[in-house]
Amino acid sequence: MLFEQIAANKRKTVFIVIGFFIFVLMVGAAIGIIVWNNYLNGLILAAVIGAFYILIMVMTSSSVVMAMNRAKRITSKEQAPVLWDTVESMAMVASIPMPKVYIMNDLSLNAFSAGISPEKGAVAVTQGLLDNLERYELEGVIAHEVSHIRNYDIRLSTISIALVAVIAILSDLAMRMIFWGSVTGSRNNRKNDNNSGGGAQLIIYIVALVFVVLAPIIATAIQFALSRNREYLADASAIELTRNPDGLIQALQKVSGDTKKMKEVSASSESIYFSSPLKSKKDKPGIFDSHPPISSRIERLENM
């Protein structure tokens, strides 16, 4: 059951990622139709901006995320022996280099991981998590975060965030070009096409325009669907490492019952946390939720 769930989550992720890239290209094509009356120009624009933005995000993600979330690095075992030992042992079981260790001075119960590869991995936990979890519960949380690193989820999350940003940039660019009359020439060409093609070209233009306007919303929903799926995968992978579902289950129960809100958290980092630091812990999932409901995560773990 455990390995079947891991395999199913990986397959679902592949489909979502492929669909995400196709969606970005569709947005580019729609913009090409709107701005230049030529979908190929839009495809090229989307590919160039997308590649550049993803490269920048991947190169700077880890250090930026830690700074944005006020995480302070622990450089020796003596500073936090239990945390250090737990991260070290889980990394050893996962067969990855030991991630850098960080602590956030916050009383809420949460954690996150960063790093685009296992060699550049980092794990951060709140002081509240350290103070309130038993050792075996902490192992469950750390195993979850180490699984994110081992499964390259941070790289995937970084790319998905970059793609959402690219789509927002492309959509905004198209709207500005239309507003400032930069597409006058293409409008004239489109008008001539409408005269010869009956109104088909106008219909295509309107559909493309509506698609571009809605694209950022759809892209955000896709990004969060990917994030929710990777949370389920990290939970299952954590059990593979610890062989003790009770630790993670009880950690999730404590996190679910935690009423303290994080004092300082970056909204752009929401999806990488163990539990959403921004939204209430509800039982019903929403398409704009970065995490599945904790009750759903616990149910899946209990059924393994």
Swiss-Prot record:
Annotated family: Belongs to the peptidase M48B family.
Stored CDD domains: M48B_Htpx_like
Compartment(s) where it occurs, according to its Swiss-Prot or TrEMBL record: Cell membrane
Encoding gene (name): htpX
Membrane topology: Multi-pass membrane protein
A biological-process GO annotation: proteolysis
The protein's name in its UniProt record: Protease HtpX homolog
UniProt cofactor(s): Zn(2+)
TM regions (residue ranges): 14-34, 39-59, 161-181, 202-222
Keywords (A to Z) from UniProt: Cell membrane, Hydrolase, Membrane, Metal-binding, Metalloprotease, Protease, Transmembrane, Transmembrane helix, Zinc
InterPro entries xref list: HtpX_protease (IPR050083), Pept_M48_protease_HtpX (IPR022919), Peptidase_M48 (IPR001915)
KW Transmembrane helix (keyword) present: yes
Pfam families: Peptidase_M48 (PF01435)
Principal localisation: membrane
Top EC category: hydrolase
Keyword Hydrolase among UniProt keywords: yes
Region described as Disordered: spans on this chain: 276-295
Catalytic residues in the record: E145
Enzyme Commission identifier(s): 3.4.24.-
